[in-house]
Structure formats: structure tokens, C-alpha cells
Amino acid sequence: MVQGTMSGAGKSLLCAALCRIFAQDGWRVAPFKSQNMALNSFVTRDGLEMGRAQVVQAQAAGVEPDVRMNPILLKPSSDIGSQVIVNGEVRGQMPAAEYFRRKKQLIPDILAAYNSLADDFDIIVIEGAGSPAEINLKADDIVNMGLAKLVDAPVLLVGDIDRGGVFAQLFGTVELLEPDERARIKGLIINKFRGDVGILRPGLAMLEEKTHLPVFGVVPYLKADIEDEDSLSDRLQVKNAVKPLDAAIVRLPHISNFTDFMPLEQHPLLGVRYVQTTRELGAPDCVILPGTKNTVDDLLWLRQCGLEAAISKLARRGTPVLGVCGGYQMLGQTLADPEGTESGRPQTLRGLGLLPTQTTFAAEKRRTQSQATVTAAPFAGAHLTGYEIHTGRTTVQGAPFCTLADGTPEGCVQGQVFGTYLHGLFDSGELTEQFAAYLCRRKGIDPAAAAPISMQEYRTQQLDLLADGVRHNLDLAAVYAAMGLAQPAERGNDQ
């Protein structure tokens, strides 16, 4: 089990690396996180919802994502409450205080999922959440040491040196644990190091002396480009290098599934920016409204900050606008919430009015994987595979964006404004290339200047890069010994 000294210490990516390494070494591996809080989610083949971090880890392990890998998913819908999803199904909205009172009732679900995975796989790589030393939360812990005790898991504790104070992080965390919890920690890991590791060696020796725990490795700041489901992801902060095409994605307050746009970020001609103000928006070559966990609140925010008027003005001038899921709903004429499902109280709002659609929210959530062929003129014929996660039902009076495999029309297009419910639409190389070519033609750029990108190949390369970086800087023999396993001789450890 990998636990961290804080959120953002690198647990998710370290778990992905270990999944990849163990799979490369010939083991059947599965990831597991008992409780995940995230806005980015995924729909499995059987229509169940789980966090994307475990999806990435499953891909690293070479196995299909399975809801057992993340039995509890919390999707924040406000500053004080979340939608609670158990075994892929929505249990309802809960204020944080209520969830904390009731979460121990979910232990049977957690153990059933874990034990079922343990029957099917050789190694389970468990990810903790936040820090195990949050002393105000320890009594009801089901995701850090509380879980480690339930499943009798050895623990690796990782600290983030890039933020500074890593020795205090690790020592303080260990000191705040109970003796039986400290005994579960088999080794310490320093993550995200930049520079000469020799400078750290005196500190490492002192840390080992004070904690009575070995340091298993110092992992460098790896530049592997792996999906990050954290809503505070650096991906939303960094402005891409200047490229011929400028795509502005609105960073909504409750933005979700922004991993949809990772393929665009990798395109050699597309510069992707995440914007929050009219000044940042400027005059891009296209505007994208992403998914959101709270369409109503984010539509009101869009209106209040002036972005609604700015986007509408750009659309009237012919700038392409794309809405995905909640962003698609916002582009329509009206959004009705008769039961208060989305906003907490019955109301009807006007949308941006850029598409001839009306959306009504209902309690039942649609979750499905879909294959489709795009029918919208600029991208007609492009094949894509995606997934839907939404409560709104949208009535369309215009032309569809695409046709699903069963012949059902999906989404809407009017002029240069496009809307679809399909997450993951740009994972299809066909649509990504046609989208870029469309923008190139509008700007007089030769689209042939860019070589096609296979996101599947790119993700594989990045996962291998991540695994290689960890393999070369972690004492894998010690990691295997902590699990009571012998390190496979054929690969060994290159440290």
C-alpha cells in the first residue's frame, strides 16, 4: 500500500508505476483505492462509474478497468457536499458531515471489492488518500491505516520534496501514528527530486536514524505525461507553448473530466489554454466548454463573470464552439431542473442559446460506453469511442453531432457550434486529426504539417517512461520483500 504525507505527494502515479513494473515482471496486478474523491470519472464496460486514477493504474497493469478497483467514489457537488457513488452506482448526495458519520457502514462494500480482486490477481497495489496522520479523521479512517489494518497490507510512505520540507513531512507523519501503525510502514520514499541525490544523503541517514525506517528510494521529478485526475492538477495551471492554433478551454469552477482534452494538448499544432476570465479568453481559434459536476452553478458563474457574453460574441463572429456533456447542456436554449436534482431547488434557466436544445435534469444518471460516427459536416465520417455520465435528458431540434452504433442520433450541431455528451471523444485519432485540420483550414494552415498521433501509443510510451524512472530509483528488492515475495531474477533492479 502506498500512503503519502499529503495530497499531491505523487501516490497515484507511483501506484501506476508499480502496477506497470509488477506487470512487466510477470505478475497479475490490479490497483485498488477504497475511497476516491475526484471530479474526473470513467464508465466501465458494464456501465459503472469509477475514478480515473484507478483507470490509469489499470491501464498501466494491462488489465481492463473494473469498478472493484474503486468501490467508493465521491464527486464534490458543492463546497460542503458530494455525490456518493458505491460500487459504481449513485447512492445520493450527502453533506460531508453526514458522510463522515456513515462511511464506516461502507466497510463491507470495500472488503467485498478488495477480497474479490485478491482472488483474481497476484498483487494488489493499494493507494491511500491524503495523509494517514490527519488526527481529526483517524477514528473513522477507511482509506489509509484503517484500510491497511483491515486487509493486513504493508505500507510505503511517500513524501514530496518538490514542495519543500520533505524530512519534516516524513518524520512528522511517522511520529503522529500509533505504534501498530508505524509497524506497518516498511519503507520511506522521497518523490519529485530535482538535482544531485548526493546532496540528500546526510539527510537520508538522519531520517532513517530518527524514524528507524529505511529509505527505499529517491524518485526524480519524472516528466512522464500521465493523466492527473486531481481537480487542482498542474495541467489546468500551465499554459501550453505557443502553437499555430489556439484552443481556449473554459476552466469552470466544477470542471470535470478535463482529461478529455489531453489528446488536443499533445497535438503539434494545437496550443491549449484553460481560461477563467474574459481577458484570458481573448480571441482564440476555438472555444471549448468542458464537462462539469454542477451545470447550473457553473452556468451562473459563466454569466456573472462575463464569459457567457464573450463566448456568444465569438460564436456570432463564426468562432467554433464545442460543448462536452455539461458544456453541451449550457449551449442550449433552456436547462430545467424541476426536482432540484442538479441545483438543490426547482428552477429553469436559459442557456447560451447557441444550440436548438432543451435539457431537463432528472435523478437517474445515464452511464454507458458508446461507439459513434460523427455526422457533423467538418468531421463527418470520423469514428470515435467514448462514454456518457450525465443526469440531463436533452431534446434536440437540430442536426445531430454524431450517430451511435445502434443508429441513435447524439448531440447537436448548428453552424460552427457543436455539442455532445461523449467524454473521451478526442481519444479517437480520427476526430482529433479532423478537428485540427478543420481549424487549420479556417486559418490557412497546412494540416499536413502535423504527423498523426496515436493516443494509445503515446499513453503506452508515457507509462513505460514512468515505470522505467521508478524502477531505476527504487529498491525493488526491498519492495518485493515487504510483500513477502522474491524479486523476479529475469528483470532485476537496475539501481
Which stretches of residues belong to each language-model region?
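Flexible phosphate-sensing "switch/lid" loops adjacent to ATP/NTP-binding sites
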Residues: M1-A315, P320, D337-G340, A363-E364, ...
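Conserved catalytic-site region of short-chain dehydrogenase/reductase
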Residues: M330
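Catalytic nucleophile serine of serine hydrolases
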Residues: C325
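Conserved P-loop NTPase catalytic core
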Residues: T341-T368
